[in-house]
Amino acid sequence: MGWTFPRLIATRNEWFDDWCDHDGPACYELGTGGPRGGQIEWHYVGETGNERARIVCYARSGSHLSEIIDRHLRQGWFLYYRGFAVDTKAEARRIQDERLRRFEYDWNILLNDSSRRGS
């Protein structure tokens, strides 16, 4: 199937979580950019067993990324999402792990450093 086109999911004052229609596993990326979606910088890669539930979780500010996302939105950035639907959560994790080996995602690095310090 491949990666979806980037989708705007949040501005400073509004979350858009009603577009997601996939209830299955996916690998996904979160990034920031301007209002028209140009020059998106991808900050985070993750995997989930249910794409729709994950997006709703982000929209309700109940995720482990809440502080990072809120800070970027307050600075005037727009939050974008793109996903890669797969058949199993294991396949989503495999894609995530490949991307983590290949690219440096600053939010993943920041969260991993924080969790190591807390242990």
Label the predicted regions.
Residues A10, E67-I69, Y105, I109-L110:
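Intrinsic disorder/low-complexity signature
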Residues R102-S119:
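Intrinsically disordered, low-complexity regulatory tails
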